[in-house]
């Protein structure tokens, strides 16, 4: 009897190992892809606003309301101005570097010469 139990246990272990390696086990449900509902939930309302293939339902409240735009939030306008200033500063610096590389800075009136007193002291 113990020999029969050991043989049964060994055969069950062998069968489970073979079925797992060959893919004969219980099939796992596959994910089929995105549905409109899951994409709208995960990506938010702004991702699907640009692509409207269904009838628009204006005025009806959905499960969630659209959040106010950045300008409508408190402090949003100030934040936009500071971002604009930072972008403008970066653009001016890049334009300066481009002019400096092209050698056009020497031809502009009112600018100091390219070789400053610090550069002359280092030579």
Curated annotation (Swiss-Prot):
Give the GO molecular function terms: galanin receptor activity; galanin receptor binding; neuropeptide hormone activity; type 1 galanin receptor binding; type 2 galanin receptor binding; type 3 galanin receptor binding
What does the record list as GO biological process?
A: neuropeptide signaling pathway; positive regulation of transcription by RNA polymerase II
Residues making up the signal peptide according to the UniProt record: 1-19
Q: Which cysteines are joined by disulfide bonds?
A: none
* UniProtKB keywords: Amidation, Cleavage on pair of basic residues, Hormone, Neuropeptide, Phosphoprotein, Secreted, Signal
Main localization of the protein described in the UniProt heading: secreted
Which Gene Ontology cellular component terms are annotated? extracellular space; secretory granule
Alanine amide: residues bearing it: 61
- Propeptide span(s): 20-30
Residues annotated with Phosphoserine modification: 116-117
Q: Does Phosphoprotein count among this protein's keywords?
A: yes
Keyword set includes Secreted: yes
Write out the annotated subcellular location.
Answer: Secreted
Family assignment from sequence similarity: Belongs to the galanin family.
The entry's function note states: Endocrine hormone of the central and peripheral nervous systems that binds and activates the G protein-coupled receptors GALR1, GALR2, and GALR3. This small neuropeptide may regulate diverse physiologic functions including contraction of smooth muscle of the gastrointestinal and genitourinary tract, growth hormone and insulin release and adrenal secretion.
Protein name, UniProt field: Galanin peptides
